[in-house]
């Protein structure tokens, strides 16, 4: 525990900035490089850093497996909901032009919402994969695959 004090202090300082940078990449993705996938991976990297430093159990207290599943569903529903909204408003699936009064405004709204859905889904997926793999105990592995 004592040998990790520097890592714990530095990570407590860095993690909020990592998550803030993920939000910047998310919202800047409409105007330049970046977007949902990149932001989702950066956000998940911040969570994974927390899990590595403080442990997977402590990280799961912050974001439970059930909450991660809910985020997965919300991300997919947001993405597909924008597509369905385009159909209901008289356009094609994922036709952003019909989402606002002007085509440019509709594209802006549509891209932000779709990229946000992608970001949520990617972050939740990467977090789920990490916690599933990192949360296994060696005994469980040996029972399932035998001793090597």
Per-region residue spans from a language model:
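Cytoplasmic juxtamembrane interface segments
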Residues: 5-7, 42-66
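Short aromatic-rich membrane-water interface segments that cap or initiate transmembrane helices
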Residues: 101-116
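Transmembrane alpha-helix boundary signature
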Residues: 55-60, 83-98
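Hydrophobic alpha-helical membrane-insertion segments
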Residues: 69-85
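Extramembrane terminal tails and long inter-domain/linker segments of multi-pass membrane proteins
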Residues: 1-9, 135-148
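Hydrophobic cores of alpha-helical transmembrane segments in multi-pass inner/ER membrane proteins
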Residues: 45-51, 114-128
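Short, non-helical or kinked segments that cap or interrupt transmembrane helices
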Residues: 30-43
């Amino acid at each position: 525990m004592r040998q990790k004090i520097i890592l714990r202090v530095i990570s407590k300082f860095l993690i909020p900035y990592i998550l803030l940078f993920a939000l910047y990449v998310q919202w800047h993705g409409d105007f330049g490089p970046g977007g949902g996938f990149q932001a989702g991976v950066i956000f998940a990297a911040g969570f994974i850093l927390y899990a590595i430093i403080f442990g997977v159990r402590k990280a799961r207290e912050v974001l439970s497996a059930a909450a991660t599943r809910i985020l997965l569903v919300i991300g997919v529903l947001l993405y597909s909901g924008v597509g369905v909204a385009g159909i209901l408003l008289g356009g094609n699936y994922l036709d952003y032009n019909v989402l606002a009064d002007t085509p440019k405004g509709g594209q802006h709204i549509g891209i932000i919402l779709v990229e946000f859905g992608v970001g949520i889904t990617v972050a939740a997926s990467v977090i789920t994969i990490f916690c599933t793999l990192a949360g296994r105990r060696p005994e469980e592995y040996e029972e399932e695959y035998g001793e090597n």
